[in-house]
Design a protein with these regions (language model features):
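Ubiquitin-like/PB1-type beta-grasp interaction modules and other compact soluble beta-rich domains
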Residues: 20-158
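Secretory targeting signatures
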Residues: 1-25
Length: 158
């Protein structure tokens, strides 16, 4: 084979490999996490139609208000909760229908462990997230979080 043919083959293979890598990098991001929000021992219900698919990058869907679909890397818990109408800061939580509660700090638990980030927490695949405020048994609240995200692990179409 001549040098020209070898160069042609080399650059063709390089272009093919770069094209395949670019296509893989452009694959859609889609992970899931499970979550619950409790205010004074009562779980907020996000299964209603008014909460479904309110943002493209992060949402609940199909009437399931306990599993979050994450379609963009780096999405924070605070951003997700805002799409549901929940306001969260160091001293208050406001949940639609339940209203505002501002006499103490809300708490965040991720995968059973306390976290300090509150709204700044970046959600990860298969997380089990608990936001709790006020009265209530933390262990019972954590146990009530589903494992639907874990069951969906590896199923990027749902």
């Amino acid at each position: 084979m001549g040098r020209t043919n070898l160069l042609f083959i080399f650059f063709s293979l390089a272009a093919l490999l770069i094209g395949c890598t670019a296509q893989q990098a452009a694959a859609p991001y889609h992970t899931h996490a499970d979550f619950k929000v409790y205010v004074n021992g009562t779980a907020a219900n996000f299964s209603g139609l008014m909460y479904q698919v309110r943002a493209k990058e992060v949402h609940v869907e199909d009437g399931i208000g306990e599993r979050v679909h994450i379609h963009q890397q780096g999405v924070t818990l605070g951003h997700f909760l805002e799409t549901l109408g929940v306001q969260l800061n160091e001293s208050c939580i406001t949940v639609p229908i339940q209203g505002a509660s501002c006499s103490q700090a809300p708490h965040l638990y991720v995968n059973g462990l306390p976290r300090q980030e509150l709204g700044d927490y970046v959600m990860q695949d298969s997380d089990k997230i608990l936001v709790t405020y006020g009265e209530g048994d933390i262990q019972e609240q954590m146990a009530s979080i589903t494992d639907m995200a874990g069951e969906k692990r590896g199923m990027s179409n749902e």
